[in-house]
């Protein structure tokens, strides 16, 4: 029997984490218990090991099985990969055995090229649909260039910012179909300028390059840092999940969100999460736009929200633990894209463990085993001196994304956070939004403050996992990253200015408040 490198979501279950990775095993498990999951397949962790053994190449056998997976997906979904009439577009996502937030890479909208884009638009005369297609295309070119070809995101962000400035608009959603079409052309030109070759138009070649990129990212510097800190063996490898795209950016009847079945900061038993209308999942997690609280989804999409509440209950009853979920609504229909046991602060871990015993989900012994002893010291998080806090006036407020109190000197890059901390300075890292590359600087800082992003953004999730104080989504900050300064409530802060942030309330103060 030849090796089986590929499993469809109907062939796996949650006991197969070692082979399918956490994400793949949970997608298969959600399929098995009847939840709405777009039907795709997983390339195993063993294929990742084989990729490294073959000198960082995907062998023909693995690729052939992946294409069989594509053919199965085409049958399940009634669309064809690379077809001009009814194209199947896919996402390619990593999924290791242990959850590694933001460490590994995702590519969305794969399968688009100039011909597919033109055919999709010709088949649907609605001008809003045209905008959606060009939006998906420019996102794909940007992600593929960044993740697969390692052309920095910043080149594309600069083109977007320039386009918005030229058009006099503030948000990406305000760009028109014509603007996005022009952006896609600019992105392809930038790709050629950086790499000297044309952007690949063959969907099969795109897929192969994307799978290789996920395997390669298992060995990238930030993944290695996270593995070292969390005792994850190098030999485990990562799986690759390929699934049909569902589009949260299709129209205003669509959206995307991230939610926790309980509050990951306090442990309170209430749904906590965030939602963006007319957006793709990356927008919520990457903190590109600051989203709205999940409860507002009830007004926008009552049927999908009611179904989502049922899904949350089903998942908690099934996994007997707090779940962290990603979902998309396409034309009012709910799709589940991921679930996993959610990362939580130490106080939340204690409360959730006790509550799960009271609710009959866990025995006391199981509840004790859920608590990571390394996290208990963060119960002694620094708190501001109560009298000093009372006397201080907050300059501004963001979201209290990870509890604790932090004060120190302002720095604007992860590298500066590291070098200042090595000199013994206490620093607060201030960013527009953090990305996985910032992990070493986030570790070095006393606290993290971001202008964009919500409670489920990269900064918030990683900070909670590390027990570091974080305030996210303070949109009142006027940021000038290039000149290393920001303005808040009329005060300008430069590199080395002193600042205090409260990760419980989200308040931001000038100067140092004693802890």
What are these regions (language model features)?
Residues 1-392, 419, 425-428, 435-440, ...:
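Nucleotide/phosphate-binding sheet-loop regions of phosphoryl- and nucleotidyl-transfer enzymes
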Residues 56-58, 487-490:
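Short, hinge-like loop/turn segments at secondary-structure boundaries
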Residues 365, 389-407:
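Catalytic domains of riboflavin
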Residues 406, 410-416:
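Long, structured protein-protein interaction/assembly regions in large complexes
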Residues 429, 449-450, 488:
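Surface-exposed strand-loop junctions at beta-sheet edges and helix termini
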Residues 451, 471-473, 501-502:
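Generic beta-sheet signal
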Residues 467-479:
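Acidic, glycine-rich catalytic loops of TOPRIM or P-loop NTPase phosphate-binding modules used
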Residues 482, 489-515:
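Internal insertion modules embedded within essential enzymes
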């Amino acid at each position: 029997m030849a090796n089986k490198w590929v499993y469809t979501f109907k062939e796996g279950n949650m006991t197969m984490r070692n082979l399918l990775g956490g994400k793949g095993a949970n997608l298969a498990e959600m399929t098995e218990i009847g939840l709405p999951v777009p039907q795709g397949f997983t390339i195993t962790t063993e294929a990742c090991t084989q990729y490294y053994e073959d000198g960082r190449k995907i062998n023909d056998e693995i690729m052939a099985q992946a294409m069989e997976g594509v053919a199965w997906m085409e049958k399940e979904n009634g669309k064809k990969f690379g077809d001009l009439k009814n194209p199947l577009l896919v996402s390619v996502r990593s999924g290791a055995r242990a959850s590694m937030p933001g460490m590994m890479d995702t590519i969305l909208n794969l399968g688009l090229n100039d011909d597919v884009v033109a055919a999709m638009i010709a088949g649907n005369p609605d001008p809003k649909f045209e905008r959606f297609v060009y939006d998906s295309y420019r996102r794909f070119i940007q992600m593929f260039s960044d993740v697969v070809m390692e052309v920095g995101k910043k080149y594309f962000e600069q083109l977007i910012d320039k386009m918005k400035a030229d058009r006099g608009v503030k948000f990406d959603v305000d760009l028109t179909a014509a603007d996005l079409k022009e952006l896609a052309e600019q992105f392809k030109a930038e790709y050629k300028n950086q790499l000297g070759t044309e952007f690949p138009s063959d969907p099969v070649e795109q897929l192969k390059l994307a799978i290789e990129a996920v395997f390669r990212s298992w060995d990238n510097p930030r993944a290695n840092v996270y593995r070292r800190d969390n005792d994850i063996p190098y030999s485990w490898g990562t799986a690759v999940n390929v699934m049909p795209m569902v589009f949260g950016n299709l129209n205003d009847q669509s959206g995307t969100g991230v939610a926790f079945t309980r509050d990951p900061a306090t442990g309170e038993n209430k749904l906590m999460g965030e939602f963006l209308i007319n957006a793709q999942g990356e927008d919520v997690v990457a903190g590109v736009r600051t989203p709205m609280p999940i409860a507002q989804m009830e007004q926008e999409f009552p049927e999908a929200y009611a179904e989502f509440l049922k899904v949350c209950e089903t998942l908690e009853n099934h996994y007997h633990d707090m779940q962290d979920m990603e979902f998309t609504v396409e034309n009012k229909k709910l799709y589940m894209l991921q679930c996993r046991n959610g990362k939580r602060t130490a106080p939340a871990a204690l409360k959730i463990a006790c509550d799960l015993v009271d609710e009959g989900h866990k025995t006391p012994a199981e509840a004790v085993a859920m608590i990571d002893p390394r996290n208990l010291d963060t119960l002694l998080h620094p708190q501001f001196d109560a009298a000093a806090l009372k006397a201080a006036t907050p300059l501004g407020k963001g979201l209290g994304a990870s509890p604790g109190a932090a004060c120190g000197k302002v720095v604007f890059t992860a590298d500066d956070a590291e070098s200042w901390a090595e000199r013994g300075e206490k620093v607060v890292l201030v960013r527009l939004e953090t990305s996985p590359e910032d992990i070493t600087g986030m570790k070095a800082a006393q606290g993290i403050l971001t202008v964009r992003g919500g409670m489920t953004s990269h900064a918030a999730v990683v900070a909670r996992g590390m027990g570091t104080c974080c305030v996210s989504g303070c949109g009142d900050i006027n940021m000038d990253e290039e000149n290393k300064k920001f303005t808040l409530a009329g005060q300008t802060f430069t590199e080395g200015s002193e600042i205090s942030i409260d990760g419980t309330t989200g308040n931001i103060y000038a100067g140092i408040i004693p802890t």
